[in-house]
């Protein structure tokens, strides 16, 4: 299966790498060019036992790639995982601007059916907001799934 993971923080990098390790073709997308270049070289910016081995193996087997281009990252993807930051706003609520910004952009660029899976830690009702943001521009069918991740760092791969 062809999969895109948008965001290469802890959740995104572990998710993308483990999906590649199970035989999927995964493109991880991040706006941080320096981080993407390091990941392409197999330099892992987080601590997670065995993750570096999985990243190196899957890069060599061409199942795991990294890009700064959302368009490039999602063009062949059947599934698009959103693993984006949701920092607390001034009032303590989750700031959804990264998630909704990417959703809006996805609506402009998807050209065939996609399943968008939100792995970010978000409040109830966010999937509907993501769906609305995509649907403002989308001319094709898509579905949105909420699948928040609560990983225990250092034990996520096991």
Residue ranges and their predicted role:
Residues 88-150:
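Rossmann-like NAD(P)(H) cofactor-binding subdomain of soluble oxidoreductases
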Residues 157-158:
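Rossmann-like flavin
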Residues 76, 82-84, 119:
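Short, well-ordered coil/turn residues at beta-beta hairpins
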Residues 1-43:
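NAD(P)+-binding Rossmann beta1-loop-alpha1 motif at the extreme N-terminus of oxidoreductases
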Residues 23, 76-77, 113:
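Short, well-ordered alpha-helix to beta-strand connector turns
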Residues 51-78, 88-89, 107:
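A structured beta-alpha segment of the ubiquitous adenosine-cofactor-binding alpha/beta core
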